[in-house]
Amino acid sequence: MSASRTVICLLRNDLRLHDNEVFHWAQRNAEHIIPLYCFDPRHYQGTYHYNFPKTGPFRLRFLLDSVKDLRALLKKHGSTLLVRQGKPEDVVCELIKQLGSVSTVAFHEEVASEEKSVEEKLKEICCQNKVRVQTFWGSTLYHRDDLPFSHIGGLPDVYTQFRKAVEAQGRVRPVLSTPEQVKSPPSGLEEGPIPTFDSLGQTEPLDDCRSAFPCRGGETEALARLKHYFWDTNAVATYKETRNGMIGVDFSTKFSPWLALGCISPRYIYEQIKKYEVERTANQSTYWVIFELLWRDYFKFVALKYGNRIFYMNGLQDKHVPWNTDMKMFDAWKEGRTGVPFVDANMRELALTGFMSNRGRQNVASFLTKDLGLDWRLGAEWFEYLLVDHDVCSNYGNWLYSAGIGNDPRENRKFNMIKQGLDYDNNGDYVRQWVPELRGIKGGDVHTPWTLSNSALSHAQVSLNQTYPCPIITAPEWSRHVNNKSSGPSSSKGRKGSSYTARQHKDRGIDFYFSKNKHF
């Protein structure tokens, strides 16, 4: 093997050593390996439509943790991680010219247009410098080439059809082993400092003791989380029953932030599930973890199929909807002051921790698109900014789904905020945790403070439009759930009557917003 065979392993959303085909291939084909991560300045600019910061403080902290952890792991394996601030195509070009010995640039392929644009620029630079490009697919449970469809255009537009096809005909590739040693970079290369919050124009977020995701980034933490959730606590065995929880760390797997940055492989999770099913138990809960991984796969393959249409206002269905951009309404939504406690609690949790449960995400998305009639991209880009686990395909795919212009076979899906609050936070504990100005209201009454009598509000030290806002909007279907509230452990009915009648939601001409047949 020629001593000049140096491979640059460009890492992006694959910040791990286990089950990493880039490292696996480079170990067999290089004399020297340069693991490289670039803090791309484009990731810290504004979002496309509404100019929110693309990377918020929670995801940045998680990313910095992950980069630090990968560098530490690589050092334990005889290498290190080069870190640079700059566009990957520029950094790679400089390294090629500086070293004169780079034979190959290897990386995992991404899906969305901005990432694909970087890949095309890398290929151009490598072509100009007579350097080979080696790419891999490694972000999904099922490999792109193993799907039971002749081409990506044959991907079903309904998740259930996709799931049944891959479960019946697909196969999950085995996990690649973690290399005992990683070949070292050429001598003389500076590893480079890992940026700080200040250098990236951000302020480090404060920890919040109420957070349902108090975890840190990196492969080490990801594997520890899996061990805890599967093997130490057996929490996975009840996942299907607890996954819609709102409070606490272990009601769901919480794998998504590590999956988003590639700190853990979906195939490794699958392998551990299968091992758990053999050694402990196999039930609906263990299957449901795989079911959710398949949703993640599906959104990536949908993005492959439709390209930039996942970002279009009219969505995958090219459905014209007269979305509005009332920024006062949007500000109330994003700041958690809509006057609808279940919505506000979720939005405040997101703002203060970077995390929100899946149940919460579905509800606040439905409220923004179906109740407020706001452009779904406002919500998608706000989530992109704040979510610690932002994944472009999952985020935009889910927002399209919620807005009724994506992959949802059921038209007119609209969540009832009061019913949902009572179903998933029956006693109101979650709302009181994140909307402390309503702590004086007991039981399920906390979901509809505007329906309480003046004396009840006074007793709870709540003054509508002073200590807590009246709803910016209400929907007629909410009223049928007002009498079904728990007033505490005794589950007695909540009081009826109000000193305030909220403005009723009027039909804005968006027919699919409302359906009397749907009771979510």
Curated annotation (Swiss-Prot):
Top-rank lineage group of the source organism: Eukaryota
Limits of the Photolyase/cryptochrome alpha/beta domain: 5-141
Entry's Gene Ontology molecular function annotations: damaged DNA binding; deoxyribodipyrimidine photo-lyase activity; FAD binding; flavin adenine dinucleotide binding
InterPro entries per record: Cry_DASH, Crypto/Photolyase_FAD-like_sf, Crypto/Photolyase_N_sf, Cryptochr/Photolyase_FAD-bd, Cryptochrome/DNA_photolyase_1, DNA_photolyase_N, Rossmann-like_a/b/a_fold
Biological-process GO terms, alphabetical: photoreactive repair
Keyword terms: Chromophore, FAD, Flavoprotein
Cofactor descriptive note: Binds 1 FAD per subunit. Binds 1 5,10-methenyltetrahydrofolate (MTHF) non-covalently per subunit.
Region (Disordered): 479-504
Cofactor(s) needed for function: FAD; (6R)-5,10-methylene-5,6,7,8-tetrahydrofolate
UniProt-listed PROSITE patterns: PHR_CRY_ALPHA_BETA (PS51645)
Coiled-coil positions: none
Function: May have a photoreceptor function. Has weak cyclobutyl pyrimidine photolyase activity when expressed in E.coli and when tested in vitro.
NCBIfam families for this protein: crypto_DASH (TIGR02765)
Family statement: Belongs to the DNA photolyase class-1 family.
Name of the protein described by the UniProt record: Cryptochrome DASH
UniProt organism field: Danio rerio (Zebrafish)
Gene: cry-dash
